[in-house]
From Swiss-Prot:
One example of a Gene Ontology biological process annotation: xyloglucan biosynthetic process
Location within or outside the cell: Golgi apparatus membrane
Region (Disordered): 71-113
Gene: XXT1
Disulfide-linked positions: none
Protein name: Probable xyloglucan 6-xylosyltransferase 1
EC number: 2.4.2.39
Residues that span the membrane, as ranges: 20-42
Function text: Probable xyloglucan xylosyltransferase involved in the biosynthesis of xyloglucan in roots.
Cytoplasmic side: 1-19
Keywords: Glycoprotein, Glycosyltransferase, Golgi apparatus, Membrane, Signal-anchor, Transferase, Transmembrane, Transmembrane helix
Family classification: Belongs to the glycosyltransferase 34 family.
Length: 448
């Protein structure tokens, strides 16, 4: 030591010793910091088995859908511990059968039924407690909608599907309608536009008590909660759609009607019409070739595979004598209302008009055609679609909330505000829109 002191000097040696002591202290503090952080924050992929177990448990509890997806992937790769579970997963993932070719027999929805009116009448004689009409003019109605069995490709799409079904449930509750939500593809051949046809036929046959099915697309919402359909107008008709006679029968325009919201009576005529409508629907060569026929025949139709709406126009225009007398193309109110011409006018409607009109002044339905909130790609910017869908939902929701004394702060806000003070005599509060106990609500009739 004294040799070192003589070489570097006594003062310099003391500085070196002080630095060494400080370095030791720094290393000790660093080790203590690592130990503390490892025990509290977590060691990540270099952690202890106990900490790793905690992190795994948190991960799978917080993200159960991810755990299920990983489990499903493992089974599909043959990694499942149970051979029966593996076989079940493989069966579920089996590819669809080859598409129908042009040489195959035409597609059918099921066995031909020719006496449905007689079968249904006999059923009603056996079950008088469920008549097809709830009063002299109002039929028993089942509103039908649905979505894909798979999650939306756009994560926010599932949230807007929830808003859409909530909106429909509100309207059905106020108007005494039943509702059916479908998430099953009943026939793989009829995917896409055409998936509704097998479902409608199945519901007609399973529910003879229902007089009308009301199909509504998942991207359509009720905007007028007070509007009751003019049922007395539809006595002689079996199919009611939004459209114009001159555009369908004279111009043969492919947008002369809309199949996103329509009514179909439960009768033999409807089964026959579905049988005529369906053969253009099977995916593959049949749908592609049918699309060429529709594009050639219908005015302004772009080139793409056959869709249910174009096929409807084609059938009515080419076979008007057979079907036209039982089809009512409604344009007195918005059974379907194109969102692009409605959503920017909501504030004007609120200022100048009131619910219960159903037409351009206060539309019954706002239909977001082309938005595809559940998919990754639509015909319009996704930000605009989602913003306007939020406004449309709140526009209808305000009519429900007002019954309970609330409203959204604005059409673009999820937050609500109180619009009247609470009272000790709540039954004396006036129901301004008449939606709490509407006279048009379907009441269950009793047989005498």
């Amino acid at each position: 030591m004294w040799v070192a002191e003589r070489v570097v000097g006594e003062r310099r040696m003391r500085e070196i010793q002080r630095f060494a002591r400080n370095a030791k202290l720094t290393v000790v503090c660093l080790l203590l910091t690592v130990v503390v952080l490892r025990g509290t924050v977590g060691a990540g992929k270099f952690g202890t088995p106990q900490q790793d177990l905690i992190e795994l448990r948190h991960r799978f509890i917080s993200h159960p859908h991810r755990a299920l997806a990983e489990h499903h992937d493992a089974l599909s790769r043959g990694g499942g511990s149970s051979s029966s579970s593996g076989r079940a997963a493989q069966r579920d993932d089996e590819p669809d059968p080859p598409p129908r070719t042009l040489r195959d027999p035409p597609y059918t929805l099921g066995p031909k039924i020719s006496d449905w009116d007689e079968q249904r009448a006999a059923w009603h004689r056996r079950h008088p407690e469920t008549p097809p009409f709830v009063n002299d003019v109002k039929p028993r109605v089942l509103l039908v909608t649905g979505s894909s069995p798979k999650p939306c490709e756009n994560p926010v799409g599932d949230h807007y599907l929830l808003k859409s079904i909530k909106n429909k449930m509100d309207y059905c509750r106020v108007h005494g309608l039943e509702i059916f939500y479908n998430m099953a593809l009943l026939d793989a051949e009829m995917a896409g536009f055409w998936a509704k046809l097998p479902l409608l036929r199945a519901l007609l046959l399973a529910h003879p008590e229902i007089e009308f099915l009301w199909w509504m697309d998942s991207d359509a919402m009720f905007s007028d909660m007070a509007f009751e359909l003019p049922w007395e107008r539809y006595g002689p008709y079996n199919l009611i759609m939004h459209g114009w006679d001159e555009m369908v029968y004279d111009d043969k325009n492919w947008i002369g009607l809309n199949t996103g919201s329509f009514l179909l009576r439960n009768c033999q005529w409807s089964l026959d019409f579905l049988d005529t409508w369906a053969p253009m629907g099977p995916k593959g060569p049949v749908r592609i070739e049918a699309g060429k026929v529709l594009t050639k025949y219908l005015k302004d139709r772009p080139v793409f595979e056959a869709d249910d709406q174009s096929a409807m126009v084609y059938i009515l225009a080419t076979e008007r004598e057979k079907w036209g007398d039982k089809v009512y193309l409604e344009n007195g109110y918005y059974l379907h209302g194109y969102w692009g011409i409605l959503v920017d006018r909501y504030e004007e409607m609120l200022e100048n008009y009131h619910p219960g009109l159903g037409d351009h002044r206060w539309p019954l339905v706002t239909h977001f055609v082309g938005c595809k909130p559940c998919g990754k790609f639509g015909d319009y910017p996704v930000e605009r679609c989602l913003k306007q869908m939020e406004r449309a939902f709140n526009f209808g929701d305000n009519q429900i909330l007002q019954m309970y004394g609330f409203t959204h702060k604005s059409l673009g806000s999820r937050k609500v505000k109180r619009i009247r003070n609470e009272t000790s005599n709540p039954l004396d509060v006036k129901d301004e829109l008449g939606l709490l106990h509407p006279a048009f609500k379907a009441m269950k009739t009793t047989s005498t």
